[in-house]
Amino acid sequence: MKKWLCIICGLIYDEAQGWPSDGIAPGTAWEDVPDDWLCPDCLVGKADFEMIDITDDAPIEEVTAVSSVSVGSAVQPNTAQPLPSEVTQPAFSNDPIVIIGSGHSGYQLAVALRSQSATVPITVFTADDGALYSKPALSNALAMNKGGDALQSESALEWESRLNIRVYPHTRVEQIDRANLTLHTSIGKYAYSRLVLATGASPIEIPIEGDRSYVMSVNDLVDYRRFRTQLQDKKRIAILGDGLIGCEFANDLIESGYEVTVIGLGKWPMERLIPHQLGESLQSALTDRGVEWALQDSIARVDAMSESSAVLHLNSGKQIEADLVLSAVGLKPNVSLAELAGLEVGRGIKVNQFGQTSDENIYSLGDCVETDQGWQPYIAPINQMIPSVAKSLLDDITPISLTPTPVIVKTPLLPLTIFPVAPNAQGQWYIEHQGDDLTAGFYSPEGVMLGFALLGRQVQSLRAPWLEQLSFKQTAA
């Protein structure tokens, strides 16, 4: 049986399991899945899936668990070392490959490693419960009437058993002893042969005075469960942040029957990602559905007004009443553990063309990573990096190759696809009407297209030809 990966959101269709909730029985081959079937999480079609695995359904060879060991005291370098220009691999010890983080990148790397080696010992440390879920689905799960249990696909124990690895949930890694290849964790010391930092990214918190108990973020399944609980008996939701995630949540909440106000610093929604005309069109579509806007503004203070509602004091002096504030102002890579270990860090943990950090034994993967093309927060480049990193960890040295992949913004009221322009890129937008839809390309002064945005239902079919126009150099690892 085969497994198919949605390159947009990371959902996996397993032929052995099918998708019974959509009437697709277990054992249904991909070619027999209806052509009009859509990804349950991001609503793209079958064309945006690619095969990632072929299994014969035979159990893998049992792996002998590696026990935690205690070694000498940690010795950390005083400064970060530069990235190696070429990968160097020390000989394997009997200690496991250790992955810190059980999000999409950490889990998928464990899957890739196990698919290539039935015997290599693999250990995963995670600060949460280690449950598997699709993070991109968090911002559109309400409209699909999915609670936390519906989003969870497996518990840590289930995927630990299925992959024949070791998972330590609710365990924090406090320090990396690079000299002795040892982790200091909340449950003791643990040796590794090679280490992968898949520590993810956390919500940015802006300073807000007053009662912050009304303010929350949704960045993982635990957050989402709490969010669903907080939404009970609530009606008026203020979203702080007018970017991609803020707009997705606005669409999701308004379609679920809530009153929504979006507060953001931009002159138009998603100002950093799309040009003015497209932003205005997106704003109009959401406004027509009932979303209200307070742009070029932010929250200065929150004061409780009753047991279940608050008044938001904006920087402009405007006041808004709300029952809950969802903060969606952006993410910051989790780099503190890498910094403490003396690894080279910029906006994210810096890696070379093999996913290797400035320590030859330590790799990094996911939205904590910064390549020579910048921070990589989107799921498509993460998916493209995983196979190469897995091979390099197993001594099959393989450079990462990133190909252009769009970002599908989950705003079904007005579909939007973008290929983000790199920060500080020089150039300008050129916009064209395609009937009621809009297309926009961002071109350098030399006429090279560096990014694009497609707004509207009909132009979504144009993603492939627009991707072909992108500069390969812009997207190479």
Where is each model-derived feature located?
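FAD-binding core/adjacent interface of flavoenzyme oxidoreductases
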Residues: 40-45, 52-94, 98, 157-236, ...
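Mid-to-C-terminal Rossmann-like scaffold of FAD/NAD(P)H-dependent oxidoreductases
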Residues: 74, 79, 87, 92-96, ...
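FAD-site-proximal beta/loop scaffold in flavoenzymes
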Residues: 213-232, 311-313, 318-388
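Short linker/helix segments within small regulatory modules
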Residues: 21-36
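Residue-level detector of alpha-helix initiation sites
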Residues: 103-107, 129, 201-203, 222, ...
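Rossmann-like dinucleotide-binding cores of NAD(P)H-dependent redox enzymes
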Residues: 130, 139, 236, 245-301, ...
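Short, non-ligating residues that shape and space the ligands of small metal-coordination modules
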Residues: 15-16, 48-51
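Beta1-alpha1 glycine-rich phosphate/pyrophosphate-binding loop at the start
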Residues: 4-22, 81-165, 252-273
